[in-house]
Amino acid sequence: MIMNQEYIKVRGAKEHNLKNINVDIPRNKFVVITGLSGSGKSSLAFDTIYAEGQRRYVESLSSYARQFLHLQNKPNVESISGLSPAIAIDQKTTSKNPRSTVGTITEIYDYLRLLYARVGIPYSPATGLPIHSQTVSEMVDIINELPKGTKVYLLAPIVRGHKGEFKREIMNLKKQGFQKLIVNGEVCEIDDLPKLDKNKKHNIEVIVDRIVLDESLGNRLADSLESSLNLAEGITYLEIVELPPAVKTEFEKNQRITFSEKYSCPVSGFQLTEIEPRIFSFNSPFGACPKCEGIGKEFFFDRELIVPDQRISIKDGAIVPWGSTSSKFILETLKALADHYKFSIEVPFASLSQNVKDILFEGSGEEAIKFEFHDGSKTQIIKQPFAGIIPSLQEKDRTIESVLIKEELAKFKSEHKCTACSGFRLKDEALCVKIANFHIGEVAGMSIAALQKWFSHLEEKLNKKQLFIAERILKEITERLKFLMNVGLDYLTLSREAGTLSGGESQRIRLASQIGSGLSGVLYVLDEPSIGLHQRDNTRLIETLKRLRDLGNTVLVVEHDEETMYEADHIIDIGPGAGIHGGRVIAEGNAEEIKNFEESITGRYLSGRQTIKVPSETRVGHDNRSIELLGAVSNNLDNVDIKIPLGTFTAITGVSGSGKSSLMIHTLYKAALKHLETTSKVFPGKYRELKGLEYIDKIIDINQSPIGRTPRSNPATYTGAFTHIRDWFVELPESKARGYKVGRFSFNVKGGRCEACQGDGLIKIEMHFLPDVYVKCDICNGHRYNRETLEIKYKGKSIADILMMTVEDAMQFFEKIPLIYEKLITLNEVGLGYIKIGQSATTLSGGEAQRVKLAKELSRRSTGKTLYILDEPTTGLHIDDINKLLKVLHKLVDMGNTVLVIEHNLDVIKTADYIIDVGPEGGDKGGKIVVCGTPADIAACAESHTGRYLKQYLE
């Protein structure tokens, strides 16, 4: 008899579309929740079980602590018992902050900083030799090189960039007889110090001695140095207050020389004041490169963005930031330049000489130009150098305070590696410290796989003392690297920015971090961890999930992957359909048991009763026309040449990190877009040549970014259906009688919307210790419109009622109105019949947003010359939804278009006409074309990881 506490018992769950369901989830097991997209899987896993677990934990904290945390709303459920503390690892990407990297998220970089601080050896950038500490005698010799009569201060830096009031330290200095301090750059009497803010960082130096250098000093200098070094833990500053007049010297007034008993280069004078973890942090002023402030990149005004289309003339607006020279001042400036340098502003910019272009962009230097400015009857003549477009933009960027103007100027900027730190983000002081000939920036730039290999041989290169100090640090680093390898992220580098990671990658990084934490007794809720993962790496991911379970945790995974289902201890199938047609528990048990449930669509596919069929023949394309990309070398691409047959369904495959997105999105898509839309601000990866663009008229990347940033955007507005709905309402007799225009039926502008909630339908109430509460607007009752607008009805329904309809209901309602029906039927075709047409864009998942975009494309009149690119369109899709999606994609191809998908899903790959397999591995070992051809060709290639798994699907 199984005891009750062996289950998480959910009773009466009614969140979103869940239909009062009861479910028992085995504790300390690996459980998969599956079902069609929109069936209610996430509603059960995240919005009910995780939300309640998190809410109970937060409610147990003090009210003071709760105000700093986001409180989950209480889910619509009668009871949940047996619940553990819950941790959600979802698809939302990690921080977009450029300072957040793979190394900082996983904490490996923190251990690396500690390792370098404790066993790293500093080397002089000038000589390449190890840096040794200075003795007091060596310091005296350096000071004696200053001209006689030089007035200096000897300073002991007792506080360097720390917060506090330092009352005790100052009291001790008083007792020792010191009279003067330099506090935050100001010389102060010790009895008359400014009050220090304990929450701000301060610098305090003791003036140990004030000396005028001459022969008669004797031992005074050495004694003062020793006192200063003792006060400041081996560091002292010498500040040159005054140099003797008429003496030529390399030294300067107010110059500071740092002396350290620790590290200093006697040849170049390069010194390290400390080797502490903070100097290896690019998020600390003590470690960050001063030029790029730890970002590793510099931004500059780019000539190609300032003049994106050189085919037009200056007069017609070639210089984009200066507009179409409509400003009289700008036009007269350019005319004066043209007269002086003998060029025309009416010819294409490309035909101007390189010298003229350089002068336009960078200025005329010291050469003065005669400018005539006319203001009515007045004429002003000025003779001065021309500043140049780029220097004038830089000056404007530096002096302007308007955020809007700064954003406008940013459109003309590109980025490149910081020239000071070579993109490593750190000061020279940090980059001169090395272990086994590598500085920390070089180590962070290695792939996880290369890093694991480097660390496995590192022990041989450390001496006994270093090994003793580093033993525990090395254990922590190698453990974390192993976990990252196990979740298929061996191709990432520690320096990779978090904002550039896909949802699947960031989720697996957090998964690896959780295993590293070693927690037990926790409920982990994961959202499709297999996304973005090649079938080859899936086994390692499943083993990782099992290891998490074996630590004594309950692992609850929302997943569609068949292999994961077969390996799970228990499966809960939610369905049978999506939206209102879902929300019930259809089947429970292991994979074999699920197969026997007739109502379970998942069971039908697992048992083979229903399948995605392999096409009987493959398309060959349009008259052998193709797009050819030659010599692609961005990121890890190794001088790649590819040919994409037009009029086909082409799949780009390969293991994670092999270079698929670099090839298709960063190079092909951006290069084609730049050619087809000259004003687009995109930066393609490097390539030699792109041929065949004359055969297409547009290239569209249908990605998973939101269809809108505000709750006002919805599927009806995005697809254009709402425009036709509003037009229809305007034509109704009652609307005409009242004189209503189209704006009357918009919730974005004044007129017809409810002004109490400004068309949102909800009013936000801020709660101090609780989450913000959204309540229905009591004026419009959540309908968004005012009473007069809602009085206009079609078939008994107001415009607010129509926005609340699902796509399926709206199709039936408008079946006699072709303009509206055609927009809605495409939403249904892509499997979104369950969503409400007025559903807020912010509540749509990435997969749903992508399919709304696909529906919009389907509803357009096809030219048959469009190239569509989709990056993993199966994200978040059940196998039955994938079947529907494939019909839509093949329909686009049948209309004459070309569809290019980057995909790991073998059910999609097997239906492709043509496959380009990139690899063979990820990272440095990828970036090559392994094989191209039909699915049968790929399956026959022994070197292709994709081919090996695809073979089983073709049999």
Swiss-Prot record:
Q: What is its main location?
A: cytoplasm
**UniProt xrefs under Gene3D superfamilies:** ABC transporter ATPase domain-like, ABC transporter ATPase like domain, ATP-grasp fold, A domain, P-loop containing nucleotide triphosphate hydrolases
Tell me, which GO biological process terms does this entry list? nucleotide-excision repair; SOS response
Question: Keyword annotations for this protein?
Answer: ATP-binding, Cytoplasm, DNA damage, DNA excision, DNA repair, DNA-binding, Excision nuclease, Metal-binding, Nucleotide-binding, Repeat, SOS response, Zinc, Zinc-finger
Q: Which GO terms describe its molecular function?
A: ATP binding; ATP hydrolysis activity; DNA binding; excinuclease ABC activity; zinc ion binding
- Where does the record place the ABC transporter domain? 322-601, 621-951
Disulfide-bond pairs as recorded: none
State the CDD domains in the record.
ABC_UvrA_I, ABC_UvrA_II
Q: Where in the cell is it found?
A: Cytoplasm
Q: Where are the zinc fingers (C4-type)?
A: 754-780
**Which annotated residues bind ATP?**
35-42, 654-661
What's a Pfam family this protein contains?
UvrA_inter
* Annotated Gene Ontology cellular component terms: cytoplasm; excinuclease repair complex
Its biological purpose is as follows: The UvrABC repair system catalyzes the recognition and processing of DNA lesions. UvrA is an ATPase and a DNA-binding protein. A damage recognition complex composed of 2 UvrA and 2 UvrB subunits scans DNA for abnormalities. When the presence of a lesion has been verified by UvrB, the UvrA molecules dissociate.
State the similarity comment: Belongs to the ABC transporter superfamily. UvrA family.
Assembly with partners or alone: Forms a heterotetramer with UvrB during the search for lesions.
| Descriptive protein name | UvrABC system protein A
> From which source organism is this entry?
Rickettsia felis (strain ATCC VR-1525 / URRWXCal2)
Q: Which gene encodes it?
A: uvrA
